[in-house]
Structure formats: C-alpha cells, structure tokens
Amino acid sequence: MRIGFDAKRAFLNNTGLGNYSRDTIRVLSHFHYNNRYFLYTPIKNENPRLSFIKDNKNTFIRTPESLFNKTLKSYWRSKNIVKDLFNNKIDIYHGLSNEIPLGIEKTSIKTVVTIHDLIFIRYPHLFRTIDRKIYYTKFKSSCERADKIIAVSKQTKKDIIEFLNIPEKKITVIYQGCNDAFKSIVANNIKNITLAKYKIANQYLLYVGSIEERKNLLTILKTLKELPKQMLVVIGNGKSYKLKCLNFIKENDLHDRVIFLSGLSLEEMSAIYQSAQLMIYPSIFEGFGIPILESLFSKTPVITSEGGCFSEAGGLNS
C-alpha cells in the first residue's frame, strides 16, 4: 500500500502537531514496513527529529516541483497536491494536522484526517476573527470530505460532533503517544551534563508547552512568587503572552529563578523531565496534552487541570 502524509508539521514544527506527525510516521513506517510512505511537505527542512527516515527504505519525501507550486506553496498544499498524489499512485492520504486538500474527494484516493482540537470555537476570544473563520472552514470541510476522522481524545470527538455536526460513526478516537526517548532512563552523567549546560539547579519545577494565554504560565509564576527559592524551568516559546510573563518576572524580581529554554534535543528534554521535582501543566483546555504523557513516561509527577481531555491524558487509565 502507498500512503501519503501531509508532513508539513513534521518538518517545520517541534511542538504538538509536529510531534504527533513525526511519531505517527515513525511508528507506522517501522511496524508496517511493507507499505510505502510518502511525506509531502512544502519545505524540506533538515530536522534532527526526523533522522529516522534516513534509514527507512520505505519512506520518501516529496516537495512541490513546478515553479508555480514552489512559489505558491500554500496553494499546492491545499489543492494542487492532489495531482501529485494521483501521479504517485497514493492509496490513502492522511491529513495529520486538521485538513485534507480540496478535490481529493473526487479521486479514488481514500482519506483520513486527524483533528486535534477545536479550541478556536470553544475560546474564540483567543483568536483573531479571520483566523477563526479560516480554521472553521478548513476543519469542517475536511471532516465532511474525509472518509475517516481520527480524534486525539474523547473530548475532541465530542467537540467535532457538537460544533461541526459530523456523524459519530465517522469518528474514531486514537490517543496520541510520545517519543520513545521519554520512555528510557537517562543516565545520571547525561542529566548532570544537561543541567550544567543550561545552568539549572538540582531542585526545580518544570513547565513544557507553547507560551500562550490558554496555557496559563502566568498562574505558575504567581505561585512561584509565594515559594521562596523555588526554581522554574520553562521549555517552550511564545510572543505577546511571553512578553506579559517576562514583565511579571521583572516586576516581581523572579529573573534569577526562571529559566526559559527552547530548541532542545529529545535527549536534553528527557534529561530535564526526569530531573524535575514535578511538571506543572495548568492549561485551560487542550485537545490532548502530550507534555502530560511525556512527564508520566519520565516518572515525573504532574499537576494539571481538571476537566476536558486532562483526565484522558493523565488519569488512571492513561
């Protein structure tokens, strides 16, 4: 079987959607080796987290070929890619990040789309109006046209039915996993080297995730203010909300107790997870919450929110 993936996030994103895309490709190409896997991406970035495909003789990378498609990469990904899929004799196409291309439903290619969350509908004030309209159009259209929908949690399945009016029988819940790097014990010398490299003390709290309003990092910082000498390590990045957090840190003289990191290798992340006292994940809402899973596999306790998907990611049966 020849399986195509929308692999843009796998190449260009090192957070949630990228992790999901890479892990899906990695697991399928390893355990179902007789298939042929085609990774379609508008840009082929060298991403060390995709190093496994170099040894895979069953995995191939495809990028836009014509000058038109190279120039209008978004148009290629959302529509013109269908011709390439047909020419490559793709049997199944999997939209790994909430969408499938227009017109694919008119071909013989079977389609699967993974929907991660509908946060833009639940919390509209966190998104620009134009972005909400684009997301709604893409998500709903993709769900209606796809042969099968994967929801990453029961909460996401419920939202797809409620907000997009999609029949339940079309949706299957398949929980996300996490990279094997978090399932292996990191040697003490590697932990020590990593902590020394980033000037991290031995006793610290950990936050992992993008730095945006719904993730609620500011709540951790306000609590940190009441915990003298407690250190916090933040792995993630952001824009306006990060500036808000940085201002709070400056105003409350917390700059020597908070360390911001990004662009870490999986080995470094594993070492920091496993060395932490606990991981705090106070997000308002998620589609799943991979950092919870990464922390549990790292044998590090987690404090997270109630409701939504959090009991699925970190509950008794997680």
Which residues are covered by each model-predicted region?
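Carbohydrate transferase catalytic cores enriched for Leloir-type hexosyltransferases
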Residues: M1-S318
